[in-house]
A protein has these predicted regions:
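Active-site helical microenvironments for divalent-metal-assisted chemistry
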Residues: 12-209
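Acidic, Ala/Val/Gly-enriched low-complexity intrinsically disordered segments
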Residues: 2, 7-8, 16
């Protein structure tokens, strides 16, 4: 006869093993991203994006969380698709690819495409990506919007002219959100875009005084 208590203990050990594997993947992704960005001397907000996904949006899909940590790695470092796939699996790679644009906004296979062309193409692309990838992009944009608002709060907009009064960027994000299913994540980001719009208008008005 199987001892019920023994079954519970066995299930408990399996659960602990799964949790340990889950955390090892998360920690491995944090270490990987930290090392890759250090190699190219670039600061990145990947921990903040991870925080929005896990704490604010209550995401428990491990691959989404790992991809959130790695979402800029292909764009901004020398990491290859093969390297990421081998270390974190094809699903994580696919999620990161969905939210990534070409490096430095230059496509060597289409030299005639300008940066503006590629950016327009990218914002059209993210409207069509799967919902799991959209969650990562919402977290990414949420981080950016929050940081832009902090610039205004610190009255430092003169130090970051390209990050403020950028109504086109806000419109692109809102167009993206219109393609997303309703969620608390979508609502949070939408409110931030509206707040930044208001700060942009106030800043422009003050410049006229």
């Amino acid at each position: 006869m199987v001892n019920h208590k023994g079954e519970v203990q066995s299930l408990g050990k399996k659960s602990e093993k799964c949790y340990s594997y889950y955390m090892n993947n998360i920690e491995s992704a944090k270490e990987f991203a930290t090392r890759k960005f250090a190699e190219v001397n670039v600061e990145n907000h990947f921990l903040e994006v991870y925080g929005f996904l896990k704490e604010d949006f209550k995401v428990n899909d491990e691959n989404i969380l790992v991809a959130g940590l790695l979402h800029d790695v292909l764009e901004d470092t020398n990491t290859t698709d093969e390297e990421m796939s081998e270390k974190f699996g094809q699903d994580v790679l696919n999620l990161v690819l969905e939210v990534s644009h070409v490096k430095n906004w230059k496509d060597p296979t289409r030299p005639e495409m300008t940066k503006q062309d590629l950016m327009s193409e990218y914002y059209e692309h993210i409207r069509e990506i799967p919902g799991r990838a959209k969650l990562i992009k919402i977290a990414d944009f949420t981080s950016h919007m929050g940081n832009f608002i902090k610039i205004y709060q610190k009255n430092e907009q003169h130090l970051y002219p390209k990050f403020v009064n950028n109504d086109k960027y806000i419109t692109q994000i809102q167009n993206f959100l219109n393609s997303c299913e309703d969620s608390l994540a979508k609502e949070k980001l939408w409110k931030l875009t509206v707040e930044l719009e208001q700060k942009n208008r106030l800043s422009a008005f003050n410049m006229l005084d």
